[in-house]
Design a protein with these regions (language model features):
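Mature extracellular or exoplasmic CAP/SCP-family domains and secreted bioactive peptides
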Residues: 2-276
Length: 276
């Protein structure tokens, strides 16, 4: 027994040290389906797209996409500040081939105990316009983030924000990821310049200097409700799965209770099998 005292003291010291060093606890971040969160970043994207200089003749209006948001969340939860290489694989970033290839922008900041605001990230991406020359289609510094925000052919966006205890060498960060579909892998200009909406696809209408189409702008929920990025390895359990998971142990427990009660009530009761 006396030999245990050193270990007990060591455990108490470790416990006291753990109490002394409190871990940072951030606010709860919005879910990818949070309407306020979605409305904020979609509206900012569309406003910035409508204000490009020189003006865009073929800039499409953006709407939210569930599958892209799930891809953004899955990558963000890995807490790796690099671009998602899976989006280059057909079907790995979005199930709809018409939205391939999938584009991406990433941002991180120090986590704070205030509600997350996506405008800081999106404006930082858009500020890359200072390094972009439209006439020469050249960048004096990195400007791919700006070109992705104002890519005219992109009409779907989905974003996610997650808390990372450690992101590379940084601690306690909020990691914001946006995925876009479709993007353009060619080093072309992000849009055609000209009178706003003068080069919209046939059948489109013009609203706030952006090309709109009710079919293209439709938001699909049920279509992608069962889709998750195949590289996420997410454990998925639908309603029937949940019922089975709850029902099976409940019935097993009930059977055990019934047998136990019968044996207590009728101690001489024997379950026999007929032999031939």
């Amino acid at each position: 027994m006396p030999r245990l005292w050193p270990w007990v003291l060591l455990g108490l010291v470790a416990l006291e040290g753990a109490r002394g060093k409190k871990r940072f606890r951030p606010l709860t971040y919005p879910r990818i389906t949070n309407k306020t969160f979605i409305g904020q970043y979609v509206d900012i994207h569309n406003r910035l797209r409508s204000e490009v200089q020189p003006p865009a003749a073929d800039m499409l209006h953006m709407t939210w996409d569930l599958a892209l948001a799930r891809t953004a969340r899955a990558w963000g939860q890995k807490c790796i500040f690099q671009h998602n290489h899976f989006t280059k694989i057909k079907g790995a970033g979005h199930p709809d081939p018409n939205l391939h290839p999938v584009g991406e922008n990433i941002w991180f900041g120090h986590a704070r105990r205030v509600p997350f605001n996506s405008s800081n990230a999106i404006y930082s991406w858009y500020s890359d316009k200072d390094f972009y020359d439209y006439q020469d289609n050249s960048c004096s510094q990195v400007c791919r983030r700006y070109k992705q925000v104002v890519r005219a052919s992109t009409y779907k966006v989905g974003c996610a924000v997650v808390f990372c205890r450690r992101l590379d060498r940084h601690r306690n960060t909020e990691y914001f990821v946006c995925n876009y579909g479709p993007t353009d892998t060619y080093p072309s200009r992000p849009y055609k310049t000209g009178q706003p909406c003068s080069a919209c696809p046939e059948g489109d209408t013009c609203q706030d200097y952006l090309c709109r189409n009710s079919s293209r702008d439709k938001i699909y929920i049920k279509r992608y409700s069962r889709w998750y990025p195949p590289w996420e390895h997410r454990l998925i359990c639908d309603d029937s799965c949940i019922v089975l998971a709850v029902l099976r142990p409940s019935l097993t427990l009930l059977a055990f209770v019934v047998v136990y009660c019968l044996q207590k009530r009728y101690p001489d009761l024997m379950l026999q099998t007929e032999t031939v």
